[in-house]
Amino acid sequence: MSITTHLDIVSAEHEIFSGVVELVVATGELGEIGITPGHAPLLTVLRPGEVRITLQGGTQDIYYVQGGMLEVQPHCVTILADVAERAEHLDEAAALAAKAKAEAAIASKGGDIDYSVAAAELARAVAQIRAIQKTRKKMK
């Protein structure tokens, strides 16, 4: 039997995942962070990106979060996400369209463009596309 910890992934709408895991990997403000059982207590901001979890037994699942907070306690990890969903439920066509729209907004020379908003939209779209691609690789 492997060493595990409890994980909850919760969005504003509902609980996405609750269960026992061996590993959690998420995109924090300073880069990727891996949480294993017994990790030191931690509170960090999450950036838009994937959350990879390794379930008891070695199966991996991939989720997409659009930012939020990650809290680590001695026997529990909690992700409070602004938006969260399973990566396989993401709409690839919509993510590609959002990426193209954000890139066009950044490339335009118009004065009415809010570049920080366009950059945030681009980051979200790219994160969704990466999560979709990793899910596709996992299924092969």
Swiss-Prot record:
Pfam families: ATP-synt_DE, ATP-synt_DE_N
Superkingdom to which the source organism belongs: Bacteria
Transmembrane regions: none
Entry GO terms, CC: plasma membrane; proton-transporting ATP synthase complex
Gene3D superfamilies from the UniProt entry: ATP synthase delta/epsilon subunit, C-terminal domain (1.20.5.440), F0F1 ATP synthase delta/epsilon subunit, N-terminal (2.60.15.10)
Sorted UniProt keywords: ATP synthesis, Cell inner membrane, Cell membrane, CF(1), Hydrogen ion transport, Ion transport, Membrane, Transport
SUPFAM superfamilies the UniProt entry points to: Epsilon subunit of F1F0-ATP synthase C-terminal domain, Epsilon subunit of F1F0-ATP synthase N-terminal domain
Membrane topology: Peripheral membrane protein
Cell location: Cell inner membrane
GO molecular function, one term: proton-transporting ATP synthase activity, rotational mechanism
Function: Produces ATP from ADP in the presence of a proton gradient across the membrane.
Similarity field: Belongs to the ATPase epsilon chain family.
PANTHER family: ATP SYNTHASE DELTA/EPSILON CHAIN (PTHR13822), ATP SYNTHASE EPSILON CHAIN, CHLOROPLASTIC (PTHR13822:SF10)
Oligomer status and interactors: F-type ATPases have 2 components, CF(1) - the catalytic core - and CF(0) - the membrane proton channel. CF(1) has five subunits: alpha(3), beta(3), gamma(1), delta(1), epsilon(1). CF(0) has three main subunits: a, b and c.
Protein name: ATP synthase epsilon chain
